[in-house]
């Protein structure tokens, strides 16, 4: 109990009202032409965004065909493991990752294949050829890279890095020793730390408290980067998620911490609102919030800077991240982003 914080019994009983601000809902409305004219993107940037989404979709399509037909592009094989796919969520993941670099940390949701690939592709675009080669050559003693070079006929380092990312992820999912973690993590626990990609989680909402701990570590140690906690809309029915949000925004960060270090934790709670949790539809059936962004009003007076954005438009997601990351840099975290997408395929 801090003696420096006085609770005035008269003041806390004064009559009044608790006020709320409007929470923005899908306010982004720029066209591609406008974005190009304003110089926010080049044509090459937009093509790369589309390419990254296409890679994520084809990756999940590959797993689906192998699981259901034991064949992909004429290659016969099987996959007996779990498949929690992110069909339909590609734009949300690519938009999230676009501005992130290797110093930014992401923790995965229940459906993290596209999150992993998007973050990896974003890092590959930003890192130099020298940095990429050093990463690939040093990871697992170069074992994964050696396997990739057997079939990757290219002198383009970034193209080689993309194949390295895809191969390492596939090998991990298929429990192969050349996977990013010798196949011991699999689909539900794949990660690649050199790119700031931390584990996803088989427990619904499980990333929330872990990511919050990482954000506390970042703040305590003056580390660069934002922590992104990816969770689904159904996870908002889990107590640890609320505990994590509250912890990340505790008043003591603003009232008791020393000057220069005050402010909430550098974390963005990214809710992929795909409207389902297993067989339950969150909107209109299993949840009461209607829109996940509403919950920010129950955590902090700033409403966690909550916003609902169109997750089927990667440019809308990028626009939101640009603004929210600026808040984090100014020690105004945490942030709640409600990213509207859709679950096209449940499990395979």
Where would I find each of the regions flagged by the language model?
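Conserved small/polar residues in nucleotide/adenosyl-binding loops
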Residues: 346-348
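N-terminal amphipathic, basic-rich helices that act as targeting or association modules
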Residues: 2-123
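Generic recognition of stable, solvent-exposed alpha-helical segments in well-folded globular domains
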Residues: 45-48, 54, 58, 91, ...
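Cofactor-binding active-site loop characterized by glycine-rich and histidine/acidic residues
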Residues: 65, 74-267, 277-304
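Mobile "lid/hinge" segments at catalytic clefts and subdomain interfaces of large enzymes
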Residues: 342-344
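Conserved phosphate-handling catalytic cores of large alpha/beta enzymes
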Residues: 277, 284, 303-332
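Nucleic-acid-processing active sites and adjacent nucleic-acid-binding tracks
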Residues: 272-275
């Amino acid at each position: 109990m801090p003696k420096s914080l006085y609770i005035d019994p008269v003041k806390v009983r004064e009559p009044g009202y608790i006020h709320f601000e409007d929470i923005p809902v899908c306010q982004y409305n720029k066209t591609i032409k406008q974005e190009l004219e304003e110089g926010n993107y080049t044509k090459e940037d937009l093509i790369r965004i589309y390419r990254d989404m296409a890679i994520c979709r084809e990756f999940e399509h590959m797993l689906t065909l192998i699981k259901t037909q034991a064949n992909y592009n004429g290659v016969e094989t099987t996959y007996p493991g779990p498949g929690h796919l992110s069909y339909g969520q590609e734009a949300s993941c690519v938009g999230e990752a676009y501005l992130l670099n290797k110093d930014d940390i992401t923790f995965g949701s229940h459906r993290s294949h596209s999150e992993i690939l998007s973050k990896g592709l974003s890092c590959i675009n930003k890192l130099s050829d020298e940095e990429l080669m050093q990463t690939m050559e040093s990871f697992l003693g170069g074992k994964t890279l050696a396997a990739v070079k057997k079939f990757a006929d290219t002198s383009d380092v970034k193209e080689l890095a993309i194949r390295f990312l895809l191969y390492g992820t596939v090998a991990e999912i298929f429990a192969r020793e050349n996977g990013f973690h010798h196949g011991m993590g699999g689909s539900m626990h794949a990660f690649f730390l050199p790119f700031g990609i931390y584990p996803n989680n088989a427990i619904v909402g499980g990333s929330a408290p872990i990511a919050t701990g990482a954000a506390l570590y970042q703040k305590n140690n003056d580390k660069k980067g934002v922590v992104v906690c990816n969770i689904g809309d159904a996870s908002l029915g889990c107590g640890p998620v609320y505990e994590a949000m509250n912890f990340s925004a505790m008043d003591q960060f603003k009232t008791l911490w020393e000057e220069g270090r005050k402010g909430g934790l550098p974390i963005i709670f990214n809710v992929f609102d795909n409207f389902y949790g297993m067989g339950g539809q969150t909107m209109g059936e299993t949840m009461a919030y209607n829109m996940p962004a509403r919950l920010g009003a129950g955590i902090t007076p700033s409403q966690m800077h909550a916003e609902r954005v169109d997750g089927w438009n990667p440019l809308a997601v990028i626009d939101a991240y640009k603004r929210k990351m600026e808040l984090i840099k100014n020690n105004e975290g945490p942030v709640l982003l409600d990213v509207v997408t859709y679950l096209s395929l449940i499990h395979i």
